């Protein structure tokens, strides 16, 4: 299965990436390079972590993934990030899943697909 597509392709998805670290930023760049609409979210108290690229919204990855992409939306507004997103990818440490689940409560729909990372029973947290 590939997520790569071109503009106008029905496979083009709106994807919200939640998190401020290297994994969230790399996933955002990779998905954008594959043609998707990408929304990168950080809560208000962490949005400063995006200050290096907040003006241009361009993130550059170096290493195994070499890419430089302009992210569609960088926001601390949860509705702007996840509203009408096809996929929500939560890239936070296990200790933050409860916090993010509370932020997402009431802002998601049954049609959206949520992806989480790590084995801290995150799926049970988001199910509730």
Feature names for model-found ranges:
Residues 35-37, 70-71, 111:
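A generic structural signal for alpha->beta connector loops
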Residues 44, 78, 118:
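Residues at the C-termini of beta-strands that transition into short coil/loop
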Residues 39-41, 75, 89, 115:
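Hydrophobic/aromatic beta-strand patches that form the interior of the parallel beta-sheet core
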Residues 56-70:
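Short, flexible, glycine-rich and Lys/Arg-enriched loop motifs at helix boundaries
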Residues 94-128:
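Rossmann-like NAD(P)(H) cofactor-binding subdomain of soluble oxidoreductases
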Residues 3-60, 82:
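NAD(P)+-binding Rossmann beta1-loop-alpha1 motif at the extreme N-terminus of oxidoreductases
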Residues 66-108:
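Rossmann-like NAD(P)-binding element
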